């Protein structure tokens, strides 16, 4: 998983495709506030997780962490997790 700078934000690329029956969500946090995600952790929108943008474009600040989770569509239970450090957006 990589994060590259773009004007006004970042583009996050996840090499692996989403497996059938799963959905992808993400959260951006400070490095010292990364979420703990284990197998079956609930990553629903009520818990602050966001739907994955088809473009992979997100908006954060330099050195924040983007955590990306593939989860079940029913119950939003985590199945896979990745993270990357965001670069500063370009001007």
Name every feature range the model reports, one short phrase each:
Residues 4-14:
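Short coil/turn motif common to extracellular beta-sandwich-like domains
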Residues 13-21:
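Acidic, Ser/Thr
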Residues 39-52:
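Short beta-strand segments within Ig-like beta-sandwich modules, predominantly Fibronectin type-III
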Residues 49-63:
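Surface-exposed, short loops/turns at beta-strand junctions within beta-sandwich domains
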Residues 59-82:
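Beta-strand-rich modules
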